[in-house]
Swiss-Prot record:
InterPro entries: GTP-CH-I_C/QueF, GTP-CH-I_N, GTP_CycHdrlase_I, GTP_CycHdrlase_I_CS, GTP_CycHdrlase_I_dom. Homomer. GO terms for biological process: one-carbon metabolic process; tetrahydrobiopterin biosynthetic process; tetrahydrofolate biosynthetic process. It comes from Saccharolobus islandicus (strain L.S.2.15 / Lassen #1) (Sulfolobus islandicus). GO terms for cellular component: cytoplasm. Pathway: Cofactor biosynthesis; 7,8-dihydroneopterin triphosphate biosynthesis; 7,8-dihydroneopterin triphosphate from GTP: step 1/1. This is GTP cyclohydrolase 1. It catalyses: GTP + H2O = 7,8-dihydroneopterin 3'-triphosphate + formate + H(+). It is an enzyme of class 3 (hydrolase).
Length: 208
């Protein structure tokens, strides 16, 4: 978490002032009707999209399987698929838009994470200037080092990058897929393939 001495309103004012300067350098008139409020809107949008830099990481809510006396399957794999995310590419500050899939192997203690907490972790690490390869690594580390202490974590990212969509090569179809492995997933190809099959089968039967 990065520290700043400026409060939110002051941050908006300072960023907006610089956006006005950029508009002028681009040959625009920031005082014309359509642009009068643009600097402040852009400032607020940038602060929202980078909020993960200035807020503490979310805590994972832990639940325990078997606490009701029921027997649970050992080495159970939990899969959270199709977590929508958006981030800003750190090279061009243009959007990255896609989906994250998270799989983890439940520890012998039977601890599992609250569903929404995994989504919050994805959102937290997405909310900053980012590259997709690092994003999946950070999500994997956060879950692997959490209180649920999984035996393994696998995080898959699949996204469109606007830096290649609207500029440069202007490829409208290309997507980037990145995968991070931790624990048992790191060396066990069968477990990796099992997760890919789960995702493939879920897509075939339109499981949402």
């Amino acid at each position: 978490m990065q520290k700043t001495e400026l409060d939110d309103q002051k941050l908006v004012e300072e960023i907006a002032r610089r956006i006005r300067e950029i508009l002028e350098l681009l040959g625009e008139n920031p005082e014309r009707e359509g642009l009068k409020e643009t600097p402040e809107r852009v400032a607020k949008a940038l602060l929202e999209m980078t909020s993960g830099l200035r807020t503490p990481p979310p805590q994972i809510k832990v639940f325990s399987l078997g606490e009701d006396g029921e027997v649970y399957e050992k080495n159970q794999i939990v899969l959270i698929k199709d977590v929508n995310f958006s981030s800003l590419c750190e090279h061009h500050m243009l959007p990255i838009i896609g989906k994250i899939h998270v799989a983890y192997i439940v520890s012998n203690s039977g601890k599992v994470a609250g569903f929404s907490k995994i989504i919050r972790i994805v959102n937290y690490y997405s909310s900053r200037l980012q590259i997709q390869e690092r994003l999946v690594e950070q999500i994997a580390d956060a879950i692997m080092n959490s209180e649920i202490k999984p035996k393994g974590v696998m995080v898959i990212g699949n996204a469109i990058h606007m830096c290649s969509y609207v500029r440069g090569v202007k490829d409208k179809e290309a997507k980037l897929v990145s995968v991070a492995y931790r624990g048992l997933f790191k060396t066990n190809r069968a477990l990796q393939n099992h997760v890919f099959r789960l995702l493939d089968n879920a897509n075939k039967v339109n499981l949402l």
